[in-house]
Curated annotation (Swiss-Prot):
Signal peptide: none annotated. NCBIfam families: rplX_bact. This is Large ribosomal subunit protein uL24. The lineage of its organism: Bacteria, Pseudomonadati, Pseudomonadota, Gammaproteobacteria, Alteromonadales. It comes from the Bacteria. It comes from Shewanella frigidimarina (strain NCIMB 400). GO terms for molecular function: rRNA binding; structural constituent of ribosome. Gene3D superfamilies: 2.30.30.30.
Length: 104
């Protein structure tokens, strides 16, 4: 099945501590999760590794979130939207369900 949300899509977070925020998808994982730039930050205790030049300490990094907790953002309506698929000129394209415009 084709992915409804892909890398570089702008999404709205629907659930969790960052609910209502908009961000860009930086990575889509095969487990049904994705990473949104700057959101779902967790603190990781990093052990120093002098061989790699990595300093130790507490760092913040983006953690994956379930794809069902985000919705694609429709620029035309300014709201979260659903995505459908259709064929145009022999190619499968994504479109917004609310106004039938193509995604990107």
């Amino acid at each position: 099945m084709a992915a409804k949300i892909r890398r570089e899509d702008e999404v709205i977070i629907l659930a969790g501590k960052d609910k209502g925020s908009r961000g860009k998808v930086s990575q889509v994982l095969p487990t049904g999760k994705l990473i949104v730039e700057g959101f779902n930050l967790v603190k990781k205790h990093q052990k120093p590794n002098p061989q790699l030049g990595v300093a130790g300490g507490v760092i913040e990094k983006e953690a994956p979130m379930q794809a069902s907790n985000v919705a694609i953002f429709n620029q035309a309506t300014g709201k979260a939207d659903r995505v459908g698929f259709r064929f145009e000129d022999g190619k499968k394209v994504r479109f917004f369900k609310s106004n039938s415009e193509l995604v990107k």
